Amino acid sequence: MEQQSLKVVIVGGSIAGLTLAHCLHRANIDHVVLEKRAEIAPQEGASIGIWPNGARMLEQLGLYGELEKLTEPLNLMHIAFPDGFSFEDLLPTTINQRFGYPIIFLDRQKFLETLYRKYPDKSKIVTNTRVAEVQSSEKCARVITEDGTMYEGDIVVGADGVHSLVRREMWKLGDSKQPGSVPSREKTGMTVEYSCVYGISSPIVGLRAGESVNSYMDGMTVLTFHGKGGRVYWFLIQKLHQKYTYPNTPRYTVEDAERLCTDHRDTTIWKDIRIGHLWDNREVVSMTALEENLFAKWHFHRIGLMGDSIHKMTPNIGQGANSAIEDAAVFSSLLVHMMTSEGPGRPSSARIQRLLHDYQACRYERAEMIYHRSRFGARFQSRDDAVKLIVGRYVVPRIRNRLANISSMLIANGEIIQYLPFPKRSGPGWEKFRNKGEWMPYTPFALFSAILLVQHVVPLLGLTSPLLLAS
């Protein structure tokens, strides 16, 4: 593809930023990545789950094969409850068969290392560079760093995470150039109701590689994923006693993580596996507040946002990183389409603004669905109320064969990099489950739960109902 006279300045060198850099490189679009940290891939205890909707795009970029070598594909999941009952589900195997890609987990550090190592022009990734200001005019956009260096381009993309400086600068510019363009609720919309201890542990007897455990408790969820060599990636998610509004949210230390895990070390996760086993075998661990929000405004003038800076969700359904990859795919696809359809030369400010508008329009509905699915998942898995407790314990085990269908609809409607060849690796699920609806959250949960309770729980109690009699 012929080089075009356009440049993108990407702020943030994590999942969204590095994926976008790969996308732009493949399209011969000039760009630079500015990362505030001294190294691209620090080890902080985080892991990343790649589902088929993310894997397919990474395959297009020539990255997936390297990542897959580092993992053990999931094939079985166990769902456990505090009363000792548990059941197993072949959802991971079914997903692999349907889409041609397994669900995989690996160190976030290894994921970022791979993206960085496979990127061909390291001079375009500038580390140890903190952004101080973002400017946008009719002619260009500028990023000014704390040391006074200026980076100029046609578009600035904020891929700098939940605490995004680019988002704050975008708000400031919006308030200055077009008062009222940034709704006041945008600045107070992000909240915290859960904390999360996340870690990586050495192998634990009883936790088999290629399997996972979802342990649903009252006010707490423990998720474990067992990767290559039995390496255990885990999350301990706890409901907080109050709701916090960003930026006035809790900050946690490793000592806080130790205190929480020590208090619950004898809590059973599954069979004879306890929280203490995760803690005692830990290699690295961290604790954080889990911010949640779907921002309504993703762009202003020549500035656009992606990843956690616009849709921050809990890790319960494992789609945060995959959603960031989808953002990069859609943004770069629209950019390539704009440049090929309009010919060489720098696009006008108005054209850039239309591009960013189209980007949000293409992504928002799906991002909203995934955000609400994640939000629901956090509350469902922690048994947030009596209905969720009953449905989780007594209904879900009876409809386990449908769980893969719910996930399949989410996967099949995933994005793709439009200007790169579709992967040969595939499966029947992409076509079968595409545009089949997204189940939740558009069915009101109260109604959905009532139907499930009547259909599945009432018979267990030896009762009858008009709905059952009618069926």
UniProtKB/Swiss-Prot annotation:
InterPro entries: FAD-bd, FAD/NAD-bd_sf, FAD_mOase_fung. One of its GO terms (biological process) is terpenoid biosynthetic process. Its EC number is 1.-.-.-. Its main location: membrane. One of its GO terms (molecular function) is monooxygenase activity. Pathway: Secondary metabolite biosynthesis; terpenoid biosynthesis. It is found in: Membrane. Its cofactor is FAD. The chain crosses the membrane at residues 403-423, 443-463. It is a multi-pass membrane protein. It holds the Pfam family FAD_binding_3. One of its GO terms (cellular component) is membrane. The active site is at Y216. FAD binds at E35, G49, R108, D308, A321. Keywords: FAD, Flavoprotein, Membrane, Oxidoreductase, Transmembrane, Transmembrane helix. Belongs to the paxM FAD-dependent monooxygenase family. FAD-dependent monooxygenase; part of the gene cluster that mediates the biosynthesis of anditomin, a fungal meroterpenoid. The first step of the pathway is the synthesis of 3,5-dimethylorsellinic acid (DMOA) by the polyketide synthase andM. DMOA is then converted to the phthalide compound 5,7-dihydroxy-4,6-dimethylphthalide (DHDMP) by the cytochrome P450 monooxygenase andK, which is further prenylated by the prenyltransferase andD to yield farnesyl-DHDMP. Further epoxidation by the FAD-dependent monooxygenase andE leads to epoxyfarnesyl-DHDMP. This is FAD-dependent monooxygenase andE.
